[in-house]
């Protein structure tokens, strides 16, 4: 095999694998629906990308079934013409998760799964390993602010950190050496149907952990592990002392967050968290646990936690001036929304906070609109955008107004993406602006930042 073609190359997970093959000398190119910062960067790195579902746009060298591998994301429609062509003409066509699964067979995989927190936890775990004597490879679900990439490579370590995606049961293709499960709050009901099926999927994932490995499970998570007899089980918590790993003495001093990390047989005091947000303490406890189990020393843990800079779009402070603060977050599930808003409230307790939220998927909005409204009601001002459909067709009666009508705060409005900047121009700007969502709202972050900078 000499060539790898990606259908949906601009996705965060797909782009990491594309970079992996490109770094190893394969001829790589791909398709995506629209240009994005990720596709722009891939093109700069020498990977050809086109944006039309058109076989004529694919380089001729890729029309060789014996030499070309086709990788696609489940978000691509089944009737996509390029995907249909390759399936019908003898090519090996695989999902992104299948490729990751093959990589986890030849490397010692540290897989991070969960409804929430897996991107921050996996990125932090990778950083802890990378800056230590252990080192690692990593396929991340976000762009690390420390490395400005979602792919980390090592020429000396056989450890690979993998963000394990539960959508479409993708993580069932993986073969973890060790794993973290951060949470199992029901999501993707269009795939799973029931909360029981969703949690069962996580339980099956635990059965895939290899002999001699370990599971680090959030204490109290509704998951009954199905572990082999020689797979170790540990629990973790941000503050519950019943867990094997936990934090205590969490304090914020002059904008810096410190805690004591407890582990079996000892504790590490005065650990400073580089991204001083309370919700990241729990993620840090889990990442430190797996890193420690794989040989990272406690002093390496201390320095790694302090130097961690977070991930793009994970409670990322994009602008911080005396006049206004702009924070960008990927939150798209009610629990994530609640955590992000509470964190902003904790940090900026006396400030006027505006939230700009783009719901993601019609199905998720239909399932959770009441919970979304409850979380958004904690804001001083709410700006709702239309639902980002991604892979879905509209559902009758399901619009952002379902959420809007239930938000208790009367200071709320519904605007289109195209009208957002006009809305901001015509209204008083709050002290803190929080951008929330997993769709294409990220394309508005820079324009909003540029507008806010004109006020400073």
Curated annotation (Swiss-Prot):
GO terms for molecular function: ATP binding; UDP-N-acetylmuramate-L-alanine ligase activity. Gene3D superfamilies: Mur ligase, C-terminal domain, Mur-like, catalytic domain, NAD(P)-binding Rossmann-like Domain. Keywords: ATP-binding, Cell cycle, Cell division, Cell shape, Cell wall biogenesis/degradation, Cytoplasm, Ligase, Nucleotide-binding, Peptidoglycan synthesis. ATP binds at residues 114-120. Pathway: Cell wall biogenesis; peptidoglycan biosynthesis. GO terms for biological process: cell division; cell wall organization; peptidoglycan biosynthetic process; regulation of cell shape. InterPro entries: Mur-like_cat_sf, Mur_ligase_C, Mur_ligase_C_dom_sf, Mur_ligase_cen, Mur_ligase_N, MurCDEF_pg_biosynth, UDP-N-AcMur_Ala_ligase_MurC. Cell wall formation. This is UDP-N-acetylmuramate--L-alanine ligase.
């Amino acid at each position: 095999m000499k060539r790898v073609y990606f259908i949906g190359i601009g996705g965060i997970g797909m782009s990491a694998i594309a970079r992996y093959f490109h770094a190893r000398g394969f001829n790589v190119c791909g398709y995506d629906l629209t240009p994005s910062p990720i596709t722009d960067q891939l093109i700069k790195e020498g990977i050809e990308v086109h944006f039309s579902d058109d076989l004529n746009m694919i380089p001729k060298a890729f029309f060789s079934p014996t030499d070309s591998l086709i990788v696609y994301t489940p978000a691509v429609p089944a009737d996509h013409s390029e995907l249909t062509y390759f399936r019908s003409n003898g090519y090996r066509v695989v999902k992104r998760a299948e490729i990751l699964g093959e990589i986890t067979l030849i490397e010692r995989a540290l897989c991070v799964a969960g409804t929430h927190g897996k991107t921050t936890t996996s990125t932090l775990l990778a950083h802890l390993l990378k800056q230590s004597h252990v080192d690692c490879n990593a396929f991340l679900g976000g762009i690390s602010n420390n490395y400005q990439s979602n792919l980390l490579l090592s020429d000396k370590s056989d450890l690979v950190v993998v963000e394990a995606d539960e959508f479409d049961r993708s993580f069932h293709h993986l073969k973890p050496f060790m794993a973290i499960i951060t949470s199992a709050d029901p999501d993707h009901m269009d795939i799973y149907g029931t909360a029981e099926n969703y949690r069962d999927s996580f339980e099956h994932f635990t059965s895939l952990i290899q002999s001699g490995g370990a599971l680090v499970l959030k204490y109290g998570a509704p998951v009954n592990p199905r572990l082999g007899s020689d797979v170790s089980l540990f629990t973790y918590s941000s503050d519950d002392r019943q867990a094997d790993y936990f934090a205590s003495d969490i304090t914020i001093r002059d904008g810096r967050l410190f805690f004591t990390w407890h582990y079996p047989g000892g504790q590490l005091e005065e650990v400073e968290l580089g991204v001083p947000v309370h919700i990241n303490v729990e993620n840090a406890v889990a990442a430190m646990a797996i890193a420690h189990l794989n040989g990272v020393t406690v002093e390496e843990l201390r320095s790694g936690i302090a130097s961690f800079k977070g991930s793009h779009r994970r409670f990322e402070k994009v602008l911080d001036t005396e006049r206004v603060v702009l924070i960008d977050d990927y939150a798209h599930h009610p629990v994530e929304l609640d955590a992000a808003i509470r964190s902003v409230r904790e940090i900026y307790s006396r400030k006027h906070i505006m939230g700009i939220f783009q719901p993601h998927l019609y199905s998720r909005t239909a399932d959770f609109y009441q919970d979304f409204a409850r979380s958004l009601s904690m804001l001083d001002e709410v700006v709702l955008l239309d639902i980002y459909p991604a892979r879905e067709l509209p559902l009758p009666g399901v619009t952002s107004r379902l959420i809007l009508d239930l938000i208790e705060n009367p200071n709320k409005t519904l605007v289109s993406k195209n009208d957002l900047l006009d809305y901001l121009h015509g209204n008083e700007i709050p002290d803190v602006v929080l951008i929330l969502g997993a769709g294409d709202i990220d394309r508005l972050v820079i324009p909003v930042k540029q507008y806010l900078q004109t006020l400073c």
